């Protein structure tokens, strides 16, 4: 069975590949409204970072996530800096977990306003799948632009 830590390491590696591919586009192409979930490639990419950042705050009982709006990211360097911040936060959180820490339980309200009990691992799997879903969207947008997306297979399959 694959441990959630490996999934998050995979996501980080692939996230960097996709960022590097998108950074080859012009800034105008990156921020163009493409009528997708969060409109532009920039916004979709930042949304996935923001989701991870938000849930890390939840898990750490912190308020460290970026408060910047999509349009406040004005160049690739700013997006890359945010990506690297989320990478470090994720690694630091995982490294700080005690034995059994992934099993820590939380009670919260979901988007359907239902009270649910979940574990830290459940939250991290949600973070993983949120990024994977939006990566599919980014892939489709790149294809529409005539850009071949980077390889993303698990274990480089």
Explain the meaning of each model-derived region.
Residues 62-100:
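Helix-adjacent hinge/juxtasegments
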Residues 96-111:
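Acidic catalytic patch
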Residues 1-5:
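Basic/polar N-terminal segments that are highly enriched at the extreme N-terminus
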Residues 8-20, 24-69, 111-157:
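Short, contiguous alpha-helical
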Residues 6-17, 81-85, 89:
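A non-catalytic, amphipathic alpha-helix used as a structural packing/dimerization or gating element
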